[in-house]
Amino acid sequence: SQEKRQRIERVIRETKYRPSEYARTMRTKKSNRIGVLVPQIDSESVPKILSGISERMDQKNYHVLLMNSNLSLEKEIGILETFEQSQVDGLIFVASVLTKRHEKALEHMGVPVVILGQKSEKYPCIYHDDEGAACAMMEELLKSGCRRPAYIGVDRRDKAAGENRYRG
């Protein structure tokens, strides 16, 4: 009845009742949360990447859960487990490396995944062609008459790009 509805609405207002987010997630199977895992929060490119992700997720009414691994493989695996427990609807993994352990943990999560920064055969990915770009730069230098080009860039041990850029 209308009277009952008004009484319920009054009690809701007076008690400042808010429905449980957990219960809603259980009912709808959707949390409206996206996990974002970054390897190093203070790297050159991560703030720009996060800005773009945040802007797009705001447009879609998703909350971004951000975690930083500080370049620790063990921490990354733990963070992926945390995201799974948090019932994220999807994951964006800004990866400096993508190992079999990562792939196993991602598979176990059972949510859509996008990999940024590494090539993947299993998951949609966005990455730089570091080797191709370095090769194109070298060709341009040689065409312009440079005979002893030097490589000055990230260390070859840099897992994300070093060896690929050096090969190029």
Where are the regions a protein language model picked out?
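Short beta-strand segments enriched in small/hydrophobic residues
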Residues: 26-42, 140, 148-156
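N-terminal helix-turn-helix DNA-binding module of bacterial transcription factors
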Residues: 1-32
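Short, well-structured alpha-helical segments in soluble
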Residues: 74-87
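Active-site-adjacent beta->alpha loops and helix N-cap segments on the catalytic face
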Residues: 97-110
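Short beta->alpha junction loops
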Residues: 66-73
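N-terminal winged-helix
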Residues: 38-55
